[in-house]
Amino acid sequence: MASLRKTHPLLKIANDALVDLPAPSNISVWWNFGSLLGLCLAAQILTGLFLAMHYTSDITTAFSSVAHICRDVNYGWLIRNMHANGASFFFICIYLHIGRGLYYGSYLYKETWNVGVVLLLLVMMTAFVGYVLPWGQMSFWGATVITNLLSAVPYIGNSLVQWLWGGFSVDNATLTRFFAFHFLLPFIIAAMTMIHLIFLHETGSTNPAGLNSDAEKISFHPYFSYEDLLGFAMLLVALIALALFTPNLLGDPDNFTPANPLVTPPHIKPEWYFLFAYAILRSIPNKLGGVLALLFSILILMLVPILHTSKLRALTFRPLTQCLFWLLVADVMILTWIGGMPVEHPFIIIGQIASILYFTIFLFLLPTAGLAENKIFT
């Protein structure tokens, strides 16, 4: 008789995704980040739920409610630190996951890739509205600066900003709706993750060689389920270590000051995981141009499958494109550094060069290198 996990309508779905899933035998630790992102999402939803039980989304009490969570709620300080630093780990995993996809040609599964880009945008949006909730100085001014970018939209810009704010400035209405968005979006992300997985399981996973692995498949459980568990353990140890030893390492000191609309912080900057995009935004002197560059810096990922020119899938056997890939990684790191620097010489010009290089690599250098390698190989 067939086992229940193979016949039960619900268990069958879980079985096909987590137990009897055929996986390539040679996938490396770079294929662990999908499951780690699932763990991050679960941890964020769980800690966020407990924070929401004690948080108040009103400008008079928001800041002190966070202080109350840290001081008076049992293990509130731990839940808050896990949630704040969990966001950083979420983005570390997401960037490594995207980097893996770019390196090994996973983007050729177009549906999976495009759903992934939408997921990235949703996660970025969730992190942004979440950063506003503690109602510190950087929360308030970050919200003011970033939402103000919508005013660059021709004709309807100002109306759009006031509609988003719910008034003529970032105020109580803004905080309340941002809390609503921050509560809702993770569940939409969870649903989109399911769609991401459905598309992935239509084709199966890629592998480090970039070759067809149909002849050499092994079951997901126990081989990769245990490998994933090791990843879970390492991620949780790192997260708990950060949350316990240096919980404010990645935060901004300005956020220890309650929001004050009358005092602007000397350097307004987002959390570290948005700095590369912020640097691209700032590197263009025109407001609308900057906003478009900011949007395109993420949406350019959707063009990667279209711009794939090589006959080979992965970069494993493509030394020229490998160099460009690592140049891109270095460039994103430089942009991240520049995004956290004041707008003055020499940071302005470095940011502009790095921004131009970022788009040039994606739109011109990678496709050209692919064509050149085709010539070399034939």
From Swiss-Prot:
UniProt binding sites for a ubiquinone: H201
Functional note: Component of the ubiquinol-cytochrome c reductase complex (complex III or cytochrome b-c1 complex) that is part of the mitochondrial respiratory chain. The b-c1 complex mediates electron transfer from ubiquinol to cytochrome c. Contributes to the generation of a proton gradient across the mitochondrial membrane that is then used for ATP synthesis.
Binding of heme b b562, residues: H83, H182
Cofactor: record remark: Binds 2 heme b groups non-covalently.
Taxonomy, superkingdom: Eukaryota
Subcellular location: Mitochondrion inner membrane
Pfam families in alphabetical order: Cytochrom_B_C (PF00032), Cytochrome_B (PF00033)
Transmembrane annotation, as ranges: 33-53, 77-98, 113-133, 178-198, 226-246, 288-308, 320-340, 347-367
Topological category with respect to the lipid bilayer: Multi-pass membrane protein
Quaternary structure and partners: The cytochrome bc1 complex contains 3 respiratory subunits (MT-CYB, CYC1 and UQCRFS1), 2 core proteins (UQCRC1 and UQCRC2) and probably 6 low-molecular weight proteins.
Protein name as annotated: Cytochrome b
Cofactor: heme b
The organism's taxonomic lineage, starting at the top: Eukaryota, Metazoa, Chordata, Craniata, Vertebrata
Keywords: Electron transport, Heme, Iron, Membrane, Metal-binding, Mitochondrion, Mitochondrion inner membrane, Respiratory chain, Transmembrane, Transmembrane helix, Transport, Ubiquinone
Coiled coil region boundaries: none
Gene label: mt-cyb
